[in-house]
Design a protein with these regions (language model features):
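Edge beta-strands of jelly-roll/beta-sandwich modules across compartments, strongly enriched
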Residues: 109-117
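Residues within well-ordered beta-strands of beta-sheet-rich folds
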Residues: 35-37, 116
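Surface-exposed ligand/attachment interfaces on beta-rich extracellular proteins
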Residues: 1-32, 39-54, 66-110, 126-128
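Compact beta-sheet-dominated globular domain cores
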Residues: 56-62
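Short beta-strand-to-coil "C-cap" segments at the C-terminal boundary of structured domains/repeats
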Residues: 117-125
Length: 128
């Protein structure tokens, strides 16, 4: 997933496709472990210093009910290293089987974000 933002929120896109928002669709009646490795690299902006960065690894679980409702448990958010000012990372879920990676840059800071998302999914035919 990839995206660039300056002082605003963004949902990351697949392979740099900025036309459609990338949302990861999860199957109903499933439990998943997620692992998200994400990097943010400052490319400028009136308040940004080129080369500032942020790296995180986030892990947790996602229980998806038959209705599409998701219970997200974030059990590990590891700061792997950072320098200067970049922004914030959040993981979002909806009530329609959707999981997404969202980032925001600090005010007047331009940041390129990149994430690798791994999902380990166990699905059943029994309604949860």
């Amino acid at each position: 997933l990839y995206g660039e933002t300056t002082g605003s929120d963004i949902t990351l896109y697949t392979q740099g496709d900025d036309v459609k928002q990338e949302q990861i669709y999860l199957p109903s009646n499933s439990i998943s472990i997620y692992e998200v490795c994400i990097t943010g690299l400052c490319t400028g902006g009136s308040s940004g210093i080129v080369g500032d960065y942020k790296t995180n690894r986030i892990m947790g679980s996602l229980l998806v009910e038959n209705s599409g409702g998701i219970t997200k448990t974030e059990s590990l958010d590891t700061d792997l290293g950072n320098s200067g000012t970049t922004g914030n990372i959040s993981l979002d879920v909806s009530t329609s089987n959707i999981f997404s990676v969202q980032c925001s840059a600090s005010a007047n800071v331009s940041v390129n974000w990149s994430a690798v998302v791994k999902l380990y999914i166990n699905q059943t035919k029994v309604e949860i």
